[in-house]
Amino acid sequence: MTQIIPALDLIDGEVVRLVKGDYEQKKVYKYNPLKKFKEYEKAGAKELHLVDLTGAKDPSKRQFALIEKLAKEVSVNLQVGGGIRSKAEARALLDCGVKRVVIGSMAIKDATLCLEILKEFGSEAIVLALDTILKEDYVVAVNAWQEASDKKLMEVLDFYSNKGLKHILCTDISKDGTMQGVNARLYKLIHEIFPHICIQASGGVASLKDLENLKGICSGVIVGKALLDGVFSVEEGIRCLEN
């Protein structure tokens, strides 16, 4: 069944939202991240998603203490991403109690290391974040969306699915933080070609209709801004996906 996965992006402990990954287009929310996650958990969320934007920019400043506290204080699965660049970082996050680590640009820039991480920690502990943008075809973007690689999304998926990949988090960059609606066609295409891969959809969720459009296609839908802005609640999202 498709799950709603509430998300928080954190910079120096503050809950923020960026538009299309741009640190200059930042909105700060006056929420305590632990209280917010507990609120989402109480509402029925079975998984939570955290992006460490401080660590993404500077790995030496990764918010390990806060991440460990969040992982210990909530009783549901927490997955964490944000510029993970090494096996040591992935291990440190898992040691903090994180259920899944999200690997992004590394999948394109250093496939050997990415495969080592997949092998060492197992396919249930790793989510491949494939941020994509439509050129002539869907290509994967790297470096916090600063540049488009020459790697086609479907080719990357084909490569890793043959190496045991089980979970992906796919973001249509053109949609992220815009609340313009999800790119359901993209996720349907991935699901048709790779039915064994669990897809987490991200970017552009603006209404319950978006959740409806992804029901049965994706294993999870990551929702950040729509929940923070009160467009709909976790309870409403769950009801929509269960009906």
From Swiss-Prot:
Top EC category: isomerase
Source organism, top-level taxon: Bacteria
GO annotations of cellular component type: cytoplasm
Xref: CDD domains: HisA (cd04732)
Single GO term (MF): 1-(5-phosphoribosyl)-5-[(5-phosphoribosylamino)methylideneamino]imidazole-4-carboxamide isomerase activity
InterPro entries: Aldolase_TIM, His_biosynth, HisA_bact_arch, Isoase_HisA-like, Isoase_HisA-like_bact, RibuloseP-bd_barrel
Keywords: Amino-acid biosynthesis, Cytoplasm, Histidine biosynthesis, Isomerase
EC number(s) on file: 5.3.1.16
Gene3D superfamilies the record matches: Aldolase class I (3.20.20.70)
Pathway info: Amino-acid biosynthesis; L-histidine biosynthesis; L-histidine from 5-phospho-alpha-D-ribose 1-diphosphate: step 4/9
Disulfide pairings: none
Broad class of where this protein is predominantly found: cytoplasm
Catalytic activity: 1-(5-phospho-beta-D-ribosyl)-5-[(5-phospho-beta-D-ribosylamino)methylideneamino]imidazole-4-carboxamide = 5-[(5-phospho-1-deoxy-D-ribulos-1-ylimino)methylamino]-1-(5-phospho-beta-D-ribosyl)imidazole-4-carboxamide
Compartments (UniProt record): Cytoplasm
BP-aspect Gene Ontology terms: L-histidine biosynthetic process; L-tryptophan biosynthetic process
Catalytic machinery residues: D9, D131
Protein family: Belongs to the HisA/HisF family.
Official protein name in the record: 1-(5-phosphoribosyl)-5-[(5-phosphoribosylamino)methylideneamino] imidazole-4-carboxamide isomerase
